[in-house]
Amino acid sequence: MLETLYQEALKRKKEPKEGSYTSYLYDKGLDKILKKVGEEATEVVIAAKNDDKNEMANETADLLYHMAVALVETGVSLEEVEAVLQARQGKQSRIHDRPEIDQY
């Protein structure tokens, strides 16, 4: 499904369609697209915090859509993202507690 979402975003970038929300985002540019990514990411956090599975699914879908648009707009392919994920798979993380911040 992510590939389909990405391909649809790519198609709309190459073939703008009047009245299309995706075309509108591309027309407004990267700042507008990134603003929407930020809004949707925040809504995912709120849905998770509220323990609302339905809202979590809906907001995650919105975030993935806007991320696909952002990837296309910045020229990053889904294959590039997948390559990064593949390279990270199986690597041991250096997880440790960070020191408490006591001065702001």
Swiss-Prot record:
Reactions this protein catalyses: 1-(5-phospho-beta-D-ribosyl)-ATP + H2O = 1-(5-phospho-beta-D-ribosyl)-5'-AMP + diphosphate + H(+)
One GO MF term: ATP binding
Top class in the EC scheme: hydrolase
One GO BP: L-histidine biosynthetic process
Location in the cell: Cytoplasm
Pathway listed: Amino-acid biosynthesis; L-histidine biosynthesis; L-histidine from 5-phospho-alpha-D-ribose 1-diphosphate: step 2/9
Keyword Endoplasmic reticulum found: no
EC code(s) of this entry: 3.6.1.31
Gene Ontology cellular-component annotations: cytoplasm
CDD domains: NTP-PPase_HisIE_like
Keyword vocabulary terms for this entry: Amino-acid biosynthesis, ATP-binding, Cytoplasm, Histidine biosynthesis, Hydrolase, Nucleotide-binding
UniProt keyword annotation of Cytoplasm present: yes
Family: Belongs to the PRA-PH family.
Protein name as catalogued: Phosphoribosyl-ATP pyrophosphatase
Species assigned in the record: Streptococcus gordonii (strain Challis / ATCC 35105 / BCRC 15272 / CH1 / DL1 / V288)
Gene: hisE
